[in-house]
Amino acid sequence: MLVIHFKPYNNLKMSFTSTENKHLLGVYEKAINNKFAWKDKIAIAKQASFDFIELSIDESDARLQRLDWSDTEINQLHNELQAQTFCLNSMCLSAHRRFPLGSKNKTTVQQGLTIFEKACVLARKLGIRIIQLAAYDVYYEPHDTETERNFITNMRKVAELAQKYAVTIAFEVMDTPFAGTIVRCLNLIKRIGKANILLYPDIGNLSQFSTAVFDEIALGQDKIVGFHFKDTLPKQFKEVPFGTGTAQFEAALKAIHQYVPTVPILIEMWSKNDPAESTVQNVAQLKQAKQFYEQQWDLALKRVK
């Protein structure tokens, strides 16, 4: 029997007299060396002064297995979070690369829907607020009008499951043209016809498909529940060191400051998973990324003034 006494936000000191607009800052789980146990992952993120970790459920068998965690395993993670007064705020559900909702294979689609429902249950048990969805109709299969139509149809089922479990779902602005901009995601949401599908833009991805990042964020402001902060290059969407890419950080942060100043922001980066890496070294890497992030805010706000 699962017994939960977890307070997902007990690391946050809330003041109802404060009117300061300040967002929570999280870090992607994959930024932390995969060799570390959850106890160490939480400690690393906390020591680097982050507010939460975004849980990864990707297409690998190892991470898909998390959807079948026992109540004992879930309680163990709860206990670690409680002990360190930390939380998981969101889930990056990228498993639909492998099990796309737009597939022409009905078995694959059913697997994708099952994965999503299991993700909703896990999110409920872990106190996760947001499930970020990869807005691919297909990834490894050829895209055409049929895969797009299948995606629209099956996303209606996903939206209904999210309502059933009272979980917030949001499209990530993706690394493919299909959903590479906020405008395109809004168009998909309109076609799906479900108001509970929201947006979780990725600044790096958006920068490669739009020259109007500020305007895109302004347009999507009523739907936005969070942001991924990462650097990118044309045709390279992962593992671009901060400051070496072409992500339009200044425009994005100015828009966030003006239109959605309190939504959570997550620094997305990837550990090299060096077997010899220490917790101290991993903390230092996260702190370095956070410093770059803060510098970008300083630059953006200086020019606002």
Swiss-Prot record:
Catalytic activity: L-ribulose 5-phosphate = L-xylulose 5-phosphate
Pfam families: AP_endonuc_2
Gene3D superfamilies: Divalent-metal-dependent TIM barrel enzymes
Pathway(s) this gene product operates in, as recorded in its UniProt entry: Cofactor degradation; L-ascorbate degradation; D-xylulose 5-phosphate from L-ascorbate: step 3/4
Its EC number(s): 5.1.3.22
Job description of the protein: Catalyzes the isomerization of L-xylulose-5-phosphate to L-ribulose-5-phosphate. Is involved in the anaerobic L-ascorbate utilization.
Protein name (database record): Probable L-ribulose-5-phosphate 3-epimerase UlaE
